[in-house]
């Protein structure tokens, strides 16, 4: 467990109690935020793997991944700007990786988001493509990154 200013950072599965915090992070972090209803649908989506980072009683980050047959796609990563560069996104991804259900994980990132790019490279993501004009406000390409997980072969 990680400590930030005398509080333990907990990585937990997204639950109804986290909706207010998730909605707040969406508003803080994104030009086109998901609405509360979008977050609520993730609670019952069998393919959704949403994790929240909770510090004290405050949701300070979350990671959303859609998983189908071992193939993961990151839908959202958000960390409260006040708590960035403290290892929260790394902890969220670490918990996601530790679940062990992924063959690979793909995400998109703005080329201008240098901090996120540096983190993703450190976590083992490799560039695999580019989506032209993917983002708006401002218009920008998305870099497509993938991390492949090695699975142990069964004996036999």
Please describe what each predicted stretch is.
Residues 52, 58-66, 71-78:
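Conserved beta-strand in the GNAT
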């Amino acid at each position: 467990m990680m400590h930030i200013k005398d509080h333990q950072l907990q990585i937990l599965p997204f639950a109804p109690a986290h909706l207010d915090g998730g909605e707040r992070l969406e508003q803080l972090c994104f030009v086109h935020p998901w609405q509360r209803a979008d977050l609520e649908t993730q609670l019952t989506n069998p393919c959704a793997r949403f994790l929240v980072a909770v510090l004290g009683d405050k949701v300070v980050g979350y990671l959303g991944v859609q998983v189908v047959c071992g193939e993961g796609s990151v839908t959202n990563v958000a960390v409260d700007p006040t708590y960035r560069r403290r290892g929260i996104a790394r902890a969220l991804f670490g918990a996601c990786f530790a679940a062990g259900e992924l063959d690979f994980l793909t995400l998109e990132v703005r080329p201008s988001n240098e901090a996120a790019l540096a983190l993703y490279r450190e976590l083992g993501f490799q560039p695999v493509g580019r989506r032209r004009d993917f983002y708006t406000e401002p218009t920008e390409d998305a870099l497509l990154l993938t991390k492949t997980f090695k699975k142990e072969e069964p004996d036999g």
